[in-house]
C-alpha cells in the first residue's frame, strides 16, 4: 500500500501507540514493519490472533513475557564458538524462562475455552529445562558467577575465604604493633595484595615491599614481609578462580551453541506472541472489535471511532459503501467534520487490513482493498486548513495512473481551490473516470452542483454532517441520503447580521436555489428526527436485552445457590443423624459389656427402649430431609415495600421491593439477587418489619488496565503497605496472575514490611524475591490466587 496514504491517514501514530504495549525490542521492530496485508487469508488470520489475545487478556490477564529480550546477536556469537559473558547468559536465561512460563500459561483444562491460533503457537515452543536450570544455578548477576557453578570453583573460593581471613588476622596484628609508624591504623589493598600505609620517614622501620605511594609522597603502601607468602598464595588462588570461571562460562556457552536452533525458534515465537498481545492490549484500550472482512467492495462501519481522538470528544459515525452506491458525496460547510469522516474510514480500513481490531460496534465490516488513496494533504491534521488546488490535482493525477479496481479513494474538497463552476465540472469528470474503473469513492465538497449530480446519478449517494444551528457547531454525525447545506443565512442571523441584509442576499439567489436549499433543510430535519428515534429505540432495545440477560443469569445463579445450600444442609443434617446413631450404639455396647459382668441388666433394657425411640425419631428426621417444607408458616395476604418475608423454597428471608402485579407476582431481593415469586409462596416472619428499600448497585465488569508492577521506592513502610494492599485488590479484580512489587534493596526494612503483609494477605497465593531480569533482591514477585 502506498506510503503517502499511510502517512496522511496517520497510521504511523497508531503504530507508535501500539509499540508502547510491546515488551521486547524485537516485538517493537515488528510493529515498525507492520503494513496492510495483500491477501484476505493473512488479514483474517492476523485479526483472529488479535481477537484471541484480547479474550485471553480479559480472562487470564497478562502473559508471562517478562525477561524476554532480543538475543539474536548473542546466539550468533555462541554459534561461532565465542564465550558468552554472565550478562549475556542471563539474557539467554530470560528467554528460556519466558519460554517455559509461556507454555505453562497456555495449558488449560479440557472444559475451558480454547484459543486455537495462539495455543498452536505456544505448542511449538520447546522449553530447554536443563540449560535453564544450569544457567540459573551458575550465574548470580551480570558480573558474578555462583559458587555452585562447579565443585572446583566452590573449593577455590572456600580456600580464598580462609586465606583472606588468615591474612586479615595477621595484618591486624602488624597494624597494632606498628601503629606509631602508620598514617592510619588500618590496612588496604593494592594490586590484590594486602598493604599498610607507612609514613615515608619510617620506611626502614617496617620491612616489606613498596607497592604504591600517596599523591603527596608522604605515605608509602608497604606489603610487610611476613605477608608476602600469604599474599602469593591468595594471588595463585585468584588466578585459579579466574581460570575456573572461564571454563564454566565456556562450557555454558557451548551448551547454548548446541541448543541455538531451538533458542532461535523459541525467540521467534515469543517475539510473535509479544507482538500479538500488544495488539490485544491496544484493542482493549480502544474497546475494539474484530470486523468481518469482505472481498466484494462492500463495507459497513457502525459506530466507528477515530482511534487518535480523545474518547470523551470522539463522535461515533456510521458509514456504508458498495452495496446500494459506490460513491458517497459528503457536502456541507467547512469545519463540519467531513475530513474527520474521511480519515476515520481510511484509518479503520488500514488498521483492519493490518490485523488490528478496530474501535467500532460488533456488527461492522470492512472490505479488502489493495490500495487506499487519500487526497487530504500531506501535513493536514484534522483541524488544519485544506491544500491548494495544484497540490490536490497533482495527487489526483498520481491516483488515476493506478489500476483502481480494488481501491478505496478518499477526496477532501474535490475540485476546491479554483473557480466553483470549473472545479465542480472537474470533480464530476474525475468521479466518472474513477467510477468507471471500479473504484469506491468518498468525496467531500460544498458545491451545490455536486449535490445535484449525486441526486441524479445512479450508484452515487449524498451525505452530510449534522449541524446544530442553535450552537453554530457541527455534531459530527453523518447523515447518509441527505445532502448538506452551507447554513450561511442561518449562521449570519444567529451572529447578528441584519434581517434586511439577509433578505437582500436571498434576492440575489435564484428561486430554484432557494427552493433546493429549503428542501435540503427539510430533509435534514426529518433525517435528524428519524436518526434520533432510531437511536432511542436501539437504546431501549439494548436495555431490555441486557435486563433479560441479567435476569436469566441471576435466575441461573439463584438455582445453583439454592441447590448447593440445600445439598449442604442435607449432608450436614445426615452427619448429625449418623453421629447420634453412633453415640447411641456406643452407649448400648458399653451396657452390654457391663451386663456380661453382671452389672446393670435392668438399665440395659431401659437403654434399649430409649435407643429404639431415638432411632425411630432420627429416622423420621432423616426422611424429612428429602422433603421441601414449603407450606410452613403463615401465608402473607398483603405486602408493603421493604417488608421482610420468608421464602420456603430458598429457606431464606427476603425483602419485598415491588407490589403485586396482575399475575399475583412480587419482586423480592435475596442477597444480591432480585427474583419474581408468587405472593402466595411468601410466609410471614416472626416480625415482618418494613425496612427502607436499599437500592443495590449493579455489578458491572469493567476491563481496566492494571499495571503488573508497582514501584514503592522512596516511601516509608506504612505508606508502602497501604499502597500495596490497594494495588493487590485492583490486581486481583483485574485478573492478573502475577505482579511485581519494586521496593529496592536499601536497608531491607521496606522489604521486610512488605513480606510481613504478604504472608497474611487474602489475595496472595505465593511470593518470592525477583530473579535476574525481574529486579533481583530489589523486587518481590507475587503470585495471586
Curated annotation (Swiss-Prot):
Q: What class of enzyme is it?
A: hydrolase
What's the EC number here?
3.1.-.-, 3.6.4.-
Alphabetized SUPFAM superfamilies for the sequence = DNA repair protein MutS, domain III (SSF48334), P-loop containing nucleoside triphosphate hydrolases (SSF52540), SMR domain-like (SSF160443)
Tell me yes or no: is Transmembrane among this UniProt entry's keywords: no
Q: Which PROSITE patterns match?
A: SMR
As for what it does, the entry says: Endonuclease that is involved in the suppression of homologous recombination and thus may have a key role in the control of bacterial genetic diversity.
Protein known as: Endonuclease MutS2
Q: Name one Pfam family in it.
A: MSSS
User: Any idea where the Smr domain is?
Assistant: 710-785
Please report which protein family the annotation says this sequence is part of.
Belongs to the DNA mismatch repair MutS family. MutS2 subfamily.
Amino acid at each position: 500500500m502506498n506510503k503517502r496514504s499511510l502517512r496522511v491517514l496517520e497510521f504511523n501514530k497508531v503504530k507508535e501507540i501500539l509499540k508502547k504495549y510491546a515488551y521486547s525490542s524485537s516485538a517493537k521492530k515488528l510493529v515498525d514493519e507492520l503494513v496492510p496485508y495483500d491477501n484476505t487469508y493473512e488479514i483474517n488470520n492476523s485479526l483472529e490472533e488479535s481477537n484471541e489475545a484480547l479474550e485471553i487478556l480479559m480472562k487470564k490477564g497478562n502473559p508471562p513475557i517478562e525477561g524476554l529480550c532480543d538475543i539474536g546477536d548473542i546466539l550468533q556469537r555462541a554459534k561461532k564458538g565465542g564465550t558468552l559473558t554472565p550478562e549475556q547468559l542471563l539474557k539467554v536465561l530470560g528467554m528460556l524462562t519466558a519460554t517455559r512460563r509461556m507454555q505453562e500459561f497456555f495449558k488449560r483444562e479440557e472444559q475451558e475455552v480454547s484459543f486455537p491460533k495462539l495455543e498452536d503457537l505456544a505448542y511449538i515452543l520447546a522449553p530447554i529445562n536443563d540449560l535453564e536450570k544450569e544457567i540459573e544455578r551458575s550465574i548470580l548477576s551480570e558480573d558474578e558467577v555462583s559458587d555452585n557453578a562447579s565443585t572446583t570453583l566452590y573449593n577455590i573460593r572456600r580456600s580464598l575465604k580462609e586465606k583472606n581471613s588468615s591474612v586479615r588476622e595477621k595484618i591486624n596484628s602488624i597494624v597494632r604493633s606498628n601503629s606509631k609508624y602508620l598514617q592510619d591504623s588500618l590496612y588496604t589493598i593494592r594490586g590484590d595484595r594486602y598493604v599498610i600505609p607507612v609514613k615515608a620517614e619510617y620506611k626502614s622501620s617496617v620491612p616489606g615491599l613498596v607497592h604504591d605511594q600517596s599523591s603527596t609522597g608522604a605515605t608509602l603502601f608497604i606489603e610487610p614481609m611476613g605477608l608476602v607468602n600469604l599474599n602469593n598464595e591468595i594471588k595463585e588462588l585468584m588466578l585459579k578462580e579466574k581460570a575456573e570461571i572461564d571454563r564454566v562460562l565456556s562450557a555454558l556457552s557451548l551448551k547454548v551453541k548446541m541448543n541455538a536452533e531451538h533458542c532461535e525458534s523459541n525467540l521467534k515465537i515469543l517475539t510473535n506472541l509479544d507482538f500479538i498481545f500488544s495488539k490485544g492490549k491496544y484493542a482493549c484500550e480502544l474497546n475494539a472489535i474484530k470486523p468481518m472482512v469482505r472481498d466484494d467492495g462492500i463495507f459497513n462501519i457502525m459506530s466507528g471511532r477515530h482511534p487518535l481522538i480523545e474518547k470523551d470528544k470522539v463522535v461515533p459515525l456510521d458509514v456504508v459503501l458498495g452495496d446500494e452506491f459506490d460513491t458517497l458525496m459528503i457536502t456541507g460547510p467547512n469545519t463540519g467534520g467531513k475530513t474527520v469522516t474521511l480519515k476515520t474510514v481510511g484509518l479503520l480500513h488500514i488498521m483492519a487490513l493490518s490485523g488490528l481490531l478496530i474501535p467500532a460496534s460488533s456488527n461492522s465490516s470492512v472490505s479488502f482493498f489493495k490500495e487506499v488513496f487519500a487526497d487530504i494533504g500531506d501535513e493536514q491534521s484534522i483541524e488544519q486548513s485544506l491544500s491548494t488546488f495544484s497540490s490536490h490535482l497533482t495527487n489526483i493525477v498520481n491516483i488515476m495512473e493506478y489500476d483502481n479496481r480494488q481501491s478505496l479513494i478518499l477526496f477532501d474538497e474535490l475540485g476546491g481551490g479554483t473557480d466553483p463552476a470549473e472545479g465542480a465540472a472537474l470533480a464530476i469528470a474525475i468521479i466518472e473516470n474513477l467510477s468507471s474503473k471500479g473504484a469506491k469513492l468518498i468525496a467531500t465538497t460544498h458545491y451545490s452542483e455536486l449535490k445535484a449530480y449525486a441526486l441524479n446519478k445512479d450508484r452515487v449517494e449524498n451525505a452530510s454532517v449534522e449541524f446544530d444551528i442553535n450552537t453554530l457547531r457541527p455534531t459530527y454525525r453523518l447523515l447518509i441520503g441527505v445532502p448538506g447545506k452551507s447554513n450561511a443565512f442561518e449562521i449570519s442571523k444567529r451572529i447578528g447580521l441584519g434581517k434586511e441584509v439577509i433578505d437582500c442576499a436571498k434576492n440575489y439567489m435564484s428561486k430554484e436555489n432557494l427552493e433546493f436549499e429549503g428542501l435540503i433543510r427539510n430533509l435534514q430535519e426529518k433525517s435528524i428526527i428519524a436518526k434520533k428515534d432510531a437511536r432511542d429505540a436501539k437504546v431501549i432495545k439494548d436495555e431490555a436485552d441486557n435486563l433479560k440477560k441479567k435476569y436469566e443469569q441471576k435466575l441461573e445463579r439463584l438455582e445453583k445457590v439454592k441447590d448447593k445450600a440445600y445439598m449442604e444442609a442435607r449432608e450436614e443434617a445426615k452427619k448429625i443423624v449418623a453421629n447420634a446413631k453412633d453415640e447411641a450404639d456406643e452407649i448400648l455396647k458399653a451396657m452390654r459389656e457391663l451386663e456380661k459382668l453382671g452389672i446393670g441388666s435392668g438399665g440395659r433394657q431401659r437403654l434399649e427402649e430409649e435407643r429404639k425411640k431415638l432411632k425411630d425419631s432420627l429416622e423420621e428426621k432423616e426422611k424429612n430431609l428429602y422433603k421441601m417444607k414449603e407450606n410452613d408458616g403463615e401465608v402473607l395476604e398483603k405486602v408493603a415495600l421493604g417488608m421482610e418475608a420468608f421464602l420456603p423454597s430458598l429457606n431464606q428471608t427476603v425483602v419485598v421491593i415491588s407490589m403485586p402485579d396482575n399475575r399475583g407476582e412480587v419482586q423480592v431481593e435475596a442477597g444480591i439477587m432480585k427474583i419474581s415469586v408468587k405472593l402466595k409462596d411468601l410466609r410471614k416472619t416472626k416480625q415482618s418489619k418494613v425496612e427502607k428499600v436499599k437500592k443495590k448497585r449493579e455489578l458491572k465488569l469493567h476491563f481496566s488496565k492494571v499495571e503488573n508492577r508497582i514501584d514503592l521506592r522512596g516511601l516509608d513502610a506504612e505508606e508502602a503497605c497501604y499502597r500495596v494492599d490497594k494495588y493487590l485488590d485492583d490486581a486481583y479484580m483485574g485478573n492478573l496472575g502475577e505482579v511485581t512489587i519494586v521496593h529496592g534493596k536499601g536497608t531491607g526494612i521496606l522489604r521486610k514490611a512488605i513480606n510481613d503483609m504478604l504472608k497474611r494477605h487474602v489475595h496472595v497465593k505465593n511470593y518470592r524475591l525477583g530473579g535476574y531480569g525481574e529486579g533481583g533482591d530489589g523486587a518481590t514477585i507475587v503470585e495471586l490466587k
